[in-house]
């Protein structure tokens, strides 16, 4: 884990020595860039200890997703109405975070783009925190270039207010106290943009429905050009957003498979196994 002045790091002798070490099988962690003790800025800072640990662990990682980069969206998004109120949903982020943990355990490098949750971060995941759908869309676009597998678990708000009031909207502002009209505009479709990007990562969606579960999931699979979709009934309190259990039906373009009720962590492991199998078969 080299650490030195940026001029020393850039010296040809240093670079030649590093090349010699690499050719002998020595792995270098870093250096990173930033402000140095001498006051200069550039490459030469030792990586943070957590980053060294993560990179070192990756060297010894094996598993069904070893060598892959998985990007997962998780949790809800919030669309502000005024400084006090917002539009959101009941998503807890539990299934998305469980999938991140399962992917890490399968050997993948994992990035999570997460809406607001109260969950502990999965160890060794790179986390990007957002609030609104536009923020999540932008974060995904920035991260997608080297992603092998994208799993869109987040319960994204489809619409947002056209304008956000700078002050709290008072009840007295409603004409004759008969309520107010909230004008909405459609948000960008995150998973469709990923599924139609070039190069396209293996793209997995979620369909959280309350009726016609399989029919609506199949429509989404086709319309958004997905490789897989996981359908679940969020109207069932036993397996809904805040439950620790889940029951799903997984759909591919040519088949379906029902997964019985189990913990969300066990469900995540099973989904990761099926994703890995499908990716391998596609290759």
Where are these regions (language model features)?
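Short, glycine-/small-residue-rich phosphate/pyrophosphate-handling segment
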Residues: 1-35, 41-56, 196-228
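Glycine-rich phosphate-binding loop
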Residues: 131-234, 238
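Short beta-strand segments
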Residues: 1-2, 71-75, 113, 152-154, ...
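Generic hydrophobic/aromatic pocket-lining and core-packing "Φ" positions
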Residues: 18, 84, 96, 100, ...
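Gly/Ser/Thr-rich active-site loops/lids in small-molecule metabolic enzymes
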Residues: 88-106, 169-191, 225-231, 258-261, ...
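Glycine-rich phosphate/pyrophosphate-binding loop and the adjoining helix
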Residues: 33-69, 87-88, 235-283
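Glycine-rich phosphate/diphosphate-binding loop of Rossmann-like nucleotide-binding domains
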Residues: 14-15, 19-20, 64-132
